[in-house]
């Protein structure tokens, strides 16, 4: 199992600044407490930590790079790759994968070489295009493989599942008028966006809306299953489902002669369990890399804890990987077949989506791009090897593209977001603009005069390469200007540019952020607020996924907020009280 280092983490340099938020480091001494006690399970600072890979050697001989990892020399590759004709001589798992009937409803998705990314990363980087399937994700494979093994009696009664994502479309797809004539009942949270509800209904499924969360919907699905005698089709917790997902590994193995590593996005673990189990029996020299969003890293937490552990809050930006606890069966399957783990931040995922678009004018979903974001890490220090990233889906909510585009330019290192204070004097703005020269240019400017003592300026700068931003900050500080680099402060990206209005001239302000479902009852939310609180700032932002953010500044004593904490907890919405966020201090304090 993984061990925790007591040393401070050392951030490794990046192969490319394509994602400035993909990190590998030794876990800090308080790694476990950070997971379990933070309001956000992984706070902003946690983006700099990742579970240390336990099957890759350390190389301390690289000057200036502590703890760099180098690839273990692999065994000789298997020359004759198995086919269905050879399956009688293979273990049961491989035999079932090779004989899977999934091709009744799916196509063998292509593997494409990404020329631009390959040149930039110095490897042969391929993408497995599961976004080309009929429901625009890999989620047809597992459900159909399981349902095709059901008896006629079970098919006649119908099936049921709970989902708010791609699985909800994968289960009903083969039904009415298609391969399996069966009724599908899909239980979905009431907070599910209409675009997904409409998509599932269009496939002929009976949609049941229940609860505010996936867990509540899942509980109700179990009750309906027992009541109506339906067969449950789980999204990942079944051997037949995992074998269906394993057909992706079989295809990759046939499509590329030599594969050094496969980067797999992980939610509940069905995809990684299926792909990893296949490769470790056929090509054990191929490294299988888990890629998780750092605010939804249920597998990383469980591996570190050496048992399945549940995240208290889960970020929904990469909604296809939004799972609070890794599956029991999938976690057990992955223990001996996963080689490394990488955690990626949201702006890194956004940068990966942009790279896929630049490469072939295709837009993939956030969880689907996680595997590509994981490749940006400097962890491997390898050249000319064959790497594969699985693009698991393309069911992107159009509204979310706005947030993705904001994060992408910052995550890719093409732009930087700076905040600064200036004396409120005539000509200071012109002086500031004169500090920007050479290859740097403005893409957005927000300026507000607040007093003769101070004015606020927020700059979005276009830059190439990234190192110019450090020179820019040094130059501004040398000129006597206070500068904050808030490029990777997600709150600043979402809200900060809209808060440049100056101080409210009140004391004891406290900054609070709530994460609420997109369809949450706003009246219920406001009723719990204390009548003694003076609300000095309020901003609501729908982010186009399963959540929206409410940013508030409250003029109140902190002790009263602590007293009211139980009532806030009763709402069931994640929140964070923060008096020290740089964007908050820049925008609303004097």
UniProtKB/Swiss-Prot annotation:
Q: Which CDD domains match?
A: ACT_ThrD-I_2 (cd04907), Thr-dehyd (cd01562)
> What GO CC terms are in its UniProt record?
chloroplast
Q: Which reaction does it catalyse?
A: L-threonine = 2-oxobutanoate + NH4(+)
The yes or no answer to whether the keyword Metal-binding is present is: no
Whether NADP counts among this entry's keywords is: no
Q: Where in the cell is it found?
A: Plastid, Chloroplast
EC number annotated for this UniProt entry: 4.3.1.19
List, alphabetically, the InterPro entries matched.
Answer: ACT-like_dom_sf (IPR045865), Ser/Thr_Dehydratase (IPR050147), TD_ACT-like (IPR001721), TD_ACT-like_sf (IPR038110), Thr_deHydtase_biosynth (IPR005787), TrpB-like_PALP (IPR001926), TrpB-like_PALP_sf (IPR036052)
**Keywords, in A-Z order:** Allosteric enzyme, Amino-acid biosynthesis, Branched-chain amino acid biosynthesis, Chloroplast, Isoleucine biosynthesis, Lyase, Plastid, Pyridoxal phosphate, Repeat, Transit peptide
Q: Which cofactor does it need?
A: pyridoxal 5'-phosphate
Tell me, what controls this protein's activity? Allosterically inhibited by isoleucine.
> Which family, according to UniProt?
Belongs to the serine/threonine dehydratase family.
**Name this protein carries in UniProt:** Threonine dehydratase biosynthetic, chloroplastic
Q: Please name the source species.
A: Cicer arietinum
């Amino acid at each position: 199992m993984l061990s925790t280092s007591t040393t401070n983490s050392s951030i490794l340099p990046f192969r490319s600044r394509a994602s400035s938020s993909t990190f590998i480091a030794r876990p800090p001494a308080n790694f476990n407490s950070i997971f379990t006690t933070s309001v956000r399970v992984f706070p902003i600072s946690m983006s700099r930590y990742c579970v240390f890979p336990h099957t890759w050697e350390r190389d301390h001989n690289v000057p200036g790079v502590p703890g760099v990892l180098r690839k273990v020399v692999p065994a000789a590759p298997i020359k004759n790759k198995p086919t269905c004709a050879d399956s009688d001589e293979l273990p049961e798992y491989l035999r079932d994968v090779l004989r899977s009937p999934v091709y009744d409803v799916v196509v063998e998705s292509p593997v494409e070489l990404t020329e631009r990314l390959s040149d930039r990363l110095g490897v042969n980087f391929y993408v497995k295009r599961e976004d080309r399937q009929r429901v625009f994700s890999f989620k047809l494979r597992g459900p159909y493989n399981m349902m095709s093994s059901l008896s006629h009696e079970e098919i006649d009664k119908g099936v049921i599942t709970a989902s708010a994502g791609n699985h909800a479309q994968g289960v009903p797809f083969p039904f009415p008028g298609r391969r399996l004539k069966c009724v599908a009942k899909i239980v979905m949270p009431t907070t599910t966006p209409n675009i997904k509800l409409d998509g599932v209904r269009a496939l002929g499924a009976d949609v049941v809306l229940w609860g505010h969360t996936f867990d509540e919907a899942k509980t109700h699905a179990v009750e309906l299953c027992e009541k109506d005698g339906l067969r449950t089709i789980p999204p990942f917790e079944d051997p037949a489902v995992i074998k269906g997902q394993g057909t992706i590994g079989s295809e990759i193995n046939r499509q590329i002669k030599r594969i050094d590593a496969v980067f797999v996005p992980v939610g509940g673990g069905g995809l990684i369990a299926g792909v990893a189990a296949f490769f470790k029996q056929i090509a054990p020299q191929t490294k299988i890399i888990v890629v998780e969003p750092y605010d939804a890293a249920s597998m990383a937490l469980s591996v570190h804890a050496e048992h399945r552990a549940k995240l208290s809050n889960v970020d929904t930006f990469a909604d296809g990987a939004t799972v609070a606890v890794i599956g029991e069966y999938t976690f057990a399957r992955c223990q001996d077949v996963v080689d490394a783990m990488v955690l990626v931040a949201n702006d890194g995922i956004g940068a990966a989506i942009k790279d896929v678009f630049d490469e072939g004018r295709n837009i993939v979903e956030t969880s689907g791009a996680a595997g590509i974001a994981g490749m940006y890490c400097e962890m491997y220090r390898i050249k000319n090897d064959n790497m594969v990233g699985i693009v698991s889906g393309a069911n992107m909510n159009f509204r979310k593209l706005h947030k993705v585009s904001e994060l992408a330019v910052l995550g890719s290192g093409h732009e930087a977001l700076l905040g600064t204070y200036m004396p409120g004097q005539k000509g200071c703005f012109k002086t500031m603009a004169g500090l920007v020269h050479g290859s740097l240019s403005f893409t957005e400017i927000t300026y507000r005069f607040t007093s003769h003592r101070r004015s606020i300026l927020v700059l979005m700068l276009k830059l190439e390469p990234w190192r110019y931003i450090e020179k820019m900050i040094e130059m501004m500080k040398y000129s006597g200007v206070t500068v904050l680099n808030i490029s990777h402060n997600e709150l600043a990206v979402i809200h900060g540019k809209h808060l440049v209005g100056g101080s409210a001239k009140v004391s004891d302000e406290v900054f609070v952020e709530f994460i609420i479902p997109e369809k949450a009852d706003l009246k219920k939310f406001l009723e719990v607020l204390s009548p003694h609180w003076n609300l000095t700032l309020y901003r609501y932002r729908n982010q186009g996924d399963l959540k929206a953010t409410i940013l508030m500044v409250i003029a109140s004593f902190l002790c009263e907020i602590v007293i009211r904490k139980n009532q806030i907890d009763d709402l069931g919405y994640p929140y964070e009280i923060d008096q020290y966020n740089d964007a908050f201090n820049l925008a609303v304090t004097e």
